[in-house]
């Protein structure tokens, strides 16, 4: 399974140019105050994540923001379904740098142990709330699956 990070602009370009990759599931982060990208013409495996791009600097802030990330368990199930179906995953957010990078890092760390490399890549600033919530949900899902 390949995990890609993509911005809204690049994703919209792929849809317009009809260059959307086959066997691909999408995790689409968007600000709740905006409309999400419509993937219905190019992809049926999409998980929409309405979540503000807020980073945190303390454990208290993390707990406060994690309450808003109430879809982590469903997202973990979606990710495992894509993994089991041998699909690639595109993690997309507005700029392709924070929420999508945090999600991609969690997926790569969980399945391959390579997600922390995204934290050292200057192209990304992974959202820690997204990373920890997705990673923890994937671990819990794997435990339940056994």
Which residues make up each language-model segment?
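Helix-loop module immediately N-terminal to the HCX5R catalytic loop
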Residues: 47-90
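Adenosine ribonucleotide-centric catalytic and binding domains
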Residues: 41-52, 115, 126-130
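Catalytic cysteine-centered active loop of the rhodanese-like fold, especially the PTP/DSP P-loop
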Residues: 81-111
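Short catalytic/ligand-binding loop motif for oxyanion handling, primarily in non-cytosolic enzymes
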Residues: 35-37, 57, 98-102
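Cysteine-dependent PTP/DSP-like catalytic domain, specifically the C-terminal lobe
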Residues: 105, 113-146
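Short, amphipathic alpha-helical segments
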Residues: 69, 98-101, 124-128
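Glycine-rich, flexible N-terminal cofactor/catalytic loop recognition
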Residues: 1-49
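Hydrophobic, Leu/Ile/Phe/Ala-enriched alpha-helical segments that form helix-helix packing faces
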Residues: 15, 75, 79-82, 134, ...
């Amino acid at each position: 399974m390949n995990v890609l990070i993509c911005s809204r602009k690049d994703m919209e370009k792929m849809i317009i140019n009809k260059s959307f990759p086959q066997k691909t599931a999408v995790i689409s982060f968007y600000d709740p105050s905006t409309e999400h990208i419509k993937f219905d013409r190019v992809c049926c495996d999409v998980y929409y994540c309405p979540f503000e791009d807020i980073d945190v600097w303390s454990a208290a802030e993390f707990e406060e923001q994690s309450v808003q990330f109430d879809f982590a368990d469903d997202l973990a199930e979606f990710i495992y379904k894509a993994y089991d179906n041998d699909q690639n995953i595109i993690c997309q957010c507005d700029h392709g740098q924070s929420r999508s990078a945090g999600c991609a890092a969690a997926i790569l760390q969980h399945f391959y142990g390579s997600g922390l490399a995204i934290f050292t890549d200057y192209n990304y600033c992974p959202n820690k709330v997204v990373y920890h919530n997705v990673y923890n949900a994937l671990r819990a899902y794997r435990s339940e699956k056994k």
